[in-house]
Amino acid sequence: MLRTMLKSKIHRATVTCADLHYVGSVTIDADLMDAADLLEGEQVTIVDIDNGARLVTYAITGERGSGVIGINGAAAHLVHPGDLVILIAYATMDDARARTYQPRIVFVDAYNKPIDMGHDPAFVPENAGELLDPRLGVG
């Protein structure tokens, strides 16, 4: 039996730009792609925390260190700059691997810089209060 499991999650990233006229995808800072073990072209689900929108697209590599989370193409109708999003990737694996697999969970600050990384999808960092809306700390 094969199971589809959580592979990677970038938690509560801030959308930095949206380009309706781009061909599609989500642009993700190369540092975040590395931290979350995402490859260019990999399928990702975007969950918009602000409005509840959910969509599936693919990742493209953004400038390293830029903090970019760019929503491209038709998805720009659903997700807007400043929105908080969760980026999720799944992997299909056999039952034995699924029982031992540890996903990559990346928490980011208001500038989309990794501040906590782990493997437990239920883990909440000590500074979770600040992560509830990292935009409050910007400025």
From Swiss-Prot:
Biological function: Catalyzes the pyruvoyl-dependent decarboxylation of aspartate to produce beta-alanine. Overexpression of wild-type protein confers resistance to pyrazinoic acid (POA), the active form of the anti-tuberculosis prodrug pyrazinamide (PZA).
Classification via CDD domains: Asp_decarbox
Lineage, top ranks: Bacteria, Bacillati, Actinomycetota, Actinomycetes, Mycobacteriales
Localization (cell): Cytoplasm
Name this polypeptide is given: Aspartate 1-decarboxylase
Any GO BP: alanine biosynthetic process
One Pfam family per UniProt: Asp_decarbox
Protein residues bound to substrate: T57, G73, A74, A75
Gene name in the database record: panD
Cofactor: pyruvate
Recorded consequence of changing A128S: In S6; may confer PZA resistance
Catalysed reactions listed for this entry: L-aspartate + H(+) = beta-alanine + CO2
Organism per entry: Mycobacterium tuberculosis (strain ATCC 25618 / H37Rv)
